Amino acid sequence: RTHDILAPFPEEFNRKMISVVTTYHFSPTEQSKKNLLAECVNDKNIIVTGNTVIDSLMLVARQAQTTPFSSDILRQLPFLKKSNVTQRIVLVTGHRRENFGDGFEEICQALHCLAIMHPDINIVYPVHLNPNVREPVNRLLSGVRNIYLIEPLDYLPFVKLMVESYIILTDSGGIQEEAPSLGKPVVVMRDTTERPESVASGTVILAGANKENIVRSIDHLLTDKSAYNKMARANNPYGDGNASVLIRKYIEERFR
C-alpha cells in the first residue's frame, strides 16, 4: 500500500478493490498483513508466504545462466561480448504516468549527467513504447556514447540483463522486489512506494523523479564500495522463492 489512490494509478486502486472481494489473502510480508488487518480483514484469512514473483524470478534466473543473449541483443549492446572485461552496467526502466512530462525530463537529464561523470559505465535503457516516454528519452539521450537505448525485452533476457547489471534505476514496483534477490541495489524514481519493506530493509533508495537526487544516489553507489555492498547484501523481505509451495500447502490442507 502507498495509501495514495493516485500513486501509482491504477495499481493502488486495483489492490484495494481486489482485497475487498478476496477471501484468502496470501500476503508477501508481515507489513502487508498489517495493512490488511487495518482494513478489517480477518486475521485467520491472511497467510504470510512471500511473493510468488520471487519464485518465478529464481526459476528464470536459473534458465538465464545457460541461455546466451540473442544476436540481436548483442548487436544493440556490443559491450556484452567482452566477457573478460570488468564493466559496470546501470540498467534503467521507466514508464510511470506520474513521471510523464517534467519527471522524464529530469530523469533523462540525470542519466545524461551520470554518463558524463562516469564514462566507464554503460547505461542500458529498454525504452517503453509509450510516446510520453519515448519522446523525451530519444530527444535527450540519443547519441550519448555510453547510453544504450534499446527496445523492450522479453522476461528471460531482461532477467539475464539484471543479473549482469551493477545498479538498477527504475520506477517499477515489481523490480523493487526482484532485483534485491539478485543482489542488485535499486534506486527508485518515485516519491512513494507500495514496497516500504524494501526501503526499510535497505535494498531500495527513493530518489524521486529528481535530477539531483538521482545523480547523487547513483554516484554514491558507484563511488562508495561500502555503501554498495551494504545494499547488495541486504536481505530481500519478499521471500526466498518458496511462496508457491506455501500457498499450495495451505490450499491442500484447507480444502482437504
Regions found by a protein language model. Give the residues of each.
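Nucleotide-activated sugar donor-binding and catalytic core shared by glycosyltransferases
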Residues: 1-125, 130-256
